[in-house]
Amino acid sequence: MPVYRPPRIAASEITPERFFLDRRSFLAAAGGLVLGGTGMAHAAALKTSASPYKVDETLTPEKDVTSYNNFYEFGTGKADPATNSASFKPTPWTVKVDGLVGKPRQFGLDELLALPLEERIYRMRCVEAWSMVIPWVGFPLASLLDKVEPLGSAKYVAFETVVRPEEMPGQAGYFQPLPWPYQEGLRLDEARHPLTILAVGLYGKTLPNQNGAPLRLVVPWKYGFKGIKSIVRISLTETAPPCTWNLAAPDEYGFYANVNPAVDHPRWSQATENRIGEGGFFGSNRRDTLPFNGYADEVAGLYAGMDLRVNF
């Protein structure tokens, strides 16, 4: 099974946060916007409420967030998702929620977009030692789980990405980088944590295809590969579910995947990271990586007594 080896990252200049805030106000006043460009034809403004969940850091430029992605269903290169996702159809969409629940059901995208949406400005740390600061739009995963009434025997939550090789060229062909569907999982207490959200947008608009439209998981204290995209199924289970990268290379990608600068990837250090969009054209901006990506005060208690070098 091939394992991805990241290239050296080239960064660009900073976009001040005020530019995003001014742009968001314009979008709200306009009531919606359809963007030109590959993979973004479905973008529309979203109504959000204020949220206390934010970081006092410069936002990563939107052009970087939407053009520098890992989404192997559209290809293994960073530009492939934006280039190859124009034909993907994120609507109509349904998400099946089943397993160890009292009220299994399917949710339509319109139902999910009608939930109270918040903007959450989170750090995002990739296992490849680069990071971004992204203004997500979404709702707590716990609020969706409450609607299906998890049983007492439920201990984990499993997620699956859609399989559409006719629209996702990375899923087509004989040689595949990963087995499909892409799968991920969390412990139930992780899934119900207030920081864990299902995102339906970023930068005040619906998600572009290359960023996981129409629905993706965001768990800000974990490495980015846990943020499964284009979700079509959520199942509650009694045992830990299979996770794609953990199955592909268990010595490199753990089930928990908590950001931990003290536990290196076998092929590179996790002590520092390169913040995308900063550092100028020729250089990189290395900074220290924070335990749990800076969210230790909120989530470290979930792992009390665990050896995080073993449970990585």
Swiss-Prot record:
Domain of life according to the entry: Bacteria
Oligomeric form and interacting partners: Heterodimer of a catalytic subunit (MsrP) and a heme-binding subunit (MsrQ).
Gene from which the chain derives: msrP
InterPro entries cross-referenced by the UniProt entry: MsrP, OxRdtase_Mopterin-bd_dom, OxRdtase_Mopterin-bd_sf, TAT_signal
One GO-annotated biological process of the protein: protein repair
NCBIfam families in the record: PRK05363.1
Gene Ontology CC terms: periplasmic space
Co-factor binding comment: Binds 1 Mo-molybdopterin (Mo-MPT) cofactor per subunit.
E.C. numbers: 1.8.5.-
Protein name, as recorded: Protein-methionine-sulfoxide reductase catalytic subunit MsrP
Record-linked PANTHER family: PROTEIN-METHIONINE-SULFOXIDE REDUCTASE (PTHR43032), PROTEIN-METHIONINE-SULFOXIDE REDUCTASE CATALYTIC SUBUNIT MSRP (PTHR43032:SF3)
Signal peptide: 1-45
Processing after translation: Predicted to be exported by the Tat system. The position of the signal peptide cleavage has not been experimentally proven.
Chief location: periplasm
Cofactor: Mo-molybdopterin
GO molecular function, one term: metal ion binding
Location(s), subcellular: Periplasm
Function of the molecule: Part of the MsrPQ system that repairs oxidized periplasmic proteins containing methionine sulfoxide residues (Met-O), using respiratory chain electrons. Thus protects these proteins from oxidative-stress damage caused by reactive species of oxygen and chlorine generated by the host defense mechanisms. MsrPQ is essential for the maintenance of envelope integrity under bleach stress, rescuing a wide series of structurally unrelated periplasmic proteins from methionine oxidation.
Catalytic activity: L-methionyl-[protein] + a quinone + H2O = L-methionyl-(S)-S-oxide-[protein] + a quinol; L-methionyl-[protein] + a quinone + H2O = L-methionyl-(R)-S-oxide-[protein] + a quinol
Keyword line: Metal-binding, Molybdenum, Oxidoreductase, Periplasm, Signal
Recorded family membership: Belongs to the MsrP family.
Positions that bind Mo-molybdopterin: 69, 72-73, 126, 161, 211, 216, 227-229
